[in-house]
Design a protein with these regions (language model features):
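Extracytosolic helix-loop segments that constitute the early lumenal/periplasmic catalytic or substrate-binding loops
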Residues: 13, 29-60, 67-70, 74
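Transmembrane-helix motifs of polytopic, lipid-linked glycan transferases
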Residues: 86-109, 145, 149
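Transmembrane-helix signature of polytopic, membrane-embedded enzymes
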Residues: 2-4, 85, 102-123, 140-141, ...
Length: 587
């Protein structure tokens, strides 16, 4: 009990400081599914989808079954609305359960289960994702709990087998990828010729998932996994996935190079990775060298795992470890071949088995030696990620809210966290064909997740100001400019890097307030031939008029709108006429 309390406190110590973390990545999609579950519990995916400007009738191709979203729906029922801190704190039950499940397995398979479990709790991948609402930790928690309960059954605990089966069902109900380690577990049971009831307890999970997918296929008229796989296999590059897999394995399992073998594997690993770097381009030599450092460390980890697995096989001992030996290569190979990218959360799924095999006989002293610097690294990465995801929420509060108070109508052309916080303020997200914005409306877009808008919208919009979102903290975890891809290797082939590159650039554009304006290469223009022309509109407060003018004329702001007055010339041209918030000019 003392050990469990210690483990729970360590997990909470990694979550509580970051519980105010802003919504980011796919969290806004999970929250949308959770809200939809209140009106369509069985099929929460049956809600209109808008993703990167593309509209679809539903989220039938959503990459996760809805069990995890049901828990979020429960939190919505309790609080009535989304709140970062209580949602993340109550979501921590999954992180605690995952560590408890790992500890139970470590007690069975390793010499120092407590310290190994502490190492797992502070590993970078687990530590960072524990404070998120992503579904990887809940899926892993149910999976590890199921394995732990199964071995409890093997030791004679009554009633543990059906509980184990229920955990497996929940795991695949949260994420399809739980089927990979579960398949390895089933293969291990078959090889050991375990009783039929044990085999059935595992088979129950894919059977339950299949039944649900059949129901979804009947309801939506499409088979969800086929849609998901059809997208993934057309997006990824196997070679880039291999490169990213090596660097991520070497950097987010434990502190780099603390898992090392003999000098020959180390030398061989560095040379092998250096050769691999010849087959792709690199933004700089420094970046390439950083990749070699991390990727060669990852290759050593995999070589060490292979050696430990071979030693385990040669020993002839079999206390149920067979599935651990299969789990790591099967999971990593799956993501390399199927994934559209590599992410730290993908490596997380293989991490328990990797630890249980590599550190099977590790001494307490060695584990302490590894745990301390790993915890420091994890804290650094968690803080860096915390800063990067919070900039969107902070920017919306500091910039968008005042614009709304001044009377501007605002639209969103954003995704992920920025989209979520704009929508929280009642701002509608535009599709690529939506022509709803009217003259004088503002549109918020950003560089990180940029997508095209309707031609008429893009042609008549004028960028008022571009904001650079950044921080002085010198570590980046998810940053295309820096090449850091902790959450997505398409951003970079290393999970983190030392850099102060800007997180994102957010632009605020305005639909030209002059309704009769037309497109030109230099921006929207209005040709005036009449002596006066009025444009009725409500002018937001605390603003000023800016424009470029070819000819002699003047613009008068009235309570009812704008009056354009032409001079003696037969025609004048107003170019980039805009209503600018005064705070933009001051900034």
């Amino acid at each position: 009990m003392k050990h469990h309390l210690l483990l729970a406190l360590v997990v909470l110590a990694g979550i509580v400081p970051f519980s105010s973390r802003a919504v980011y990545m796919d969290e806004h999609i999970f929250l949308l599914m959770a809200r939809s579950a209140h009106t369509n519990f069985l099929f929460p995916q049956d809600t209109p989808a808008l993703f990167f400007g593309q509209t679809r009738p539903s989220f039938v191709g959503h990459t996760h079954p809805p069990v995890g979203e049901y828990y979020l729906a429960l939190l919505y029922s309790i609080f009535g609305e989304f709140r970062e801190v209580p949602f993340r704190l109550l979501f921590s039950v999954f992180a605690i359960a995952a560590v408890f499940g790992f500890y139970a397995l470590a007690k069975r398979f390793t010499a120092n289960p407590l310290w190994l479990s502490l190492l797992f709790a502070v590993s970078p991948a687990f530590f960072v994702y524990s404070a998120t609402l992503m579904m990887d930790v809940p899926m892993l928690a149910c999976l590890l709990a199921g394995f732990a309960l199964y071995f409890g059954h093997v030791q004679g605990r009554r009633g543990f087998l059906p509980l184990s089966s229920m955990c497996f069902i929940l795991a695949v109900g949260i994420g399809y990828t739980a089927l990979v380690p579960l398949g390895c577990f089933f293969a291990g049971l078959l090889a050991a010729r375990r009783p039929l009831k044990e085999l059935l307890s595992v088979v129950a999970a894919p059977v339950a998932l299949t039944l649900y997918l059949v129901a979804m296929t009947i309801h939506f008229g499409a088979f969800p996994p086929a849609l998901t796989l059809g997208y993934l296999v057309t997006q990824g590059s196997v070679f880039r996935n291999v490169l990213a897999l090596l660097s991520f394995t070497g950097a987010i399992g434990v502190f780099p190079w603390l898992v090392s073998g003999k000098r020959l594997p180390i030398t061989t690993s560095v040379l092998a990775v250096a050769i691999l770097t010849l087959f792709t381009s690199w933004p700089s030599m420094v970046y390439r060298l950083w990749f070699i450092v991390l990727a060669s460390s990852g290759l050593v980890v995999l070589i060490t795992f292979a050696g430990a697995a071979r030693k385990l096989i040669v020993s002839g001992k079999n206390t149920g470890e067979a599935f651990l030996i299969l789990w790591v290569p099967a999971t990593l190979l799956f993501f390399v071949l199927i994934g559209d990218m590599i992410s730290a959360r993908y490596i997380l799924l293989a991490l328990p088995a990797l630890y249980l095999v590599i550190f099977r006989d590790a001494s307490e002293r060695r584990l302490i030696y590894i745990t301390v610097p790993t915890a420091v690294l994890s804290l650094t990465l968690a803080y860096a990620d915390f800063i990067s995801v919070n900039v969107n929420r902070d920017w919306v509060q500091q910039t968008v809210v005042p614009l709304q108070q001044e009377g501007f109508r605002i639209w969103s052309g954003a995704e992920s966290g920025l989209r979520f916080y704009l929508e929280q303020k009642g701002i509608q997200t535009l599709s690529a064909t939506d022509v709803s914005p009217k003259p004088g409306d503002l549109i918020v877009r950003h560089k990180l997740y940029h997508y095209g808008l309707a031609d008429s919208v893009g042609a008549l919009s004028i960028i008022l100001k571009t904001f650079t979102l950044t921080s002085a903290f010198p570590v980046r975890t998810y940053n295309q400019a820096a090449g850091a891809g902790f959450h997505d290797s398409n951003m970079g082939l290393v999970p983190f890097i030392f850099s102060r590159a800007a997180f994102d650039e957010v632009e605020v554009a305005e639909m030209c307030p002059l309704e009769a304006a037309v497109w030109s290469p230099e921006g929207p223009i209005f040709m005036q031939r009449e002596a006066e022309r009025e444009f009725p509109m409500k002018i937001p407060s605390n603003t000023k008029i800016e424009y470029e003018l070819d000819g002699d004329g003047a613009a008068a702001v009235m309570t009812s709108g704008i009056r354009l007055i032409k001079g003696p010339a037969p025609r004048i041209v107003w170019r980039n006429f805009r209503i600018v918030p005064k705070q933009f000019a001051l900034q």
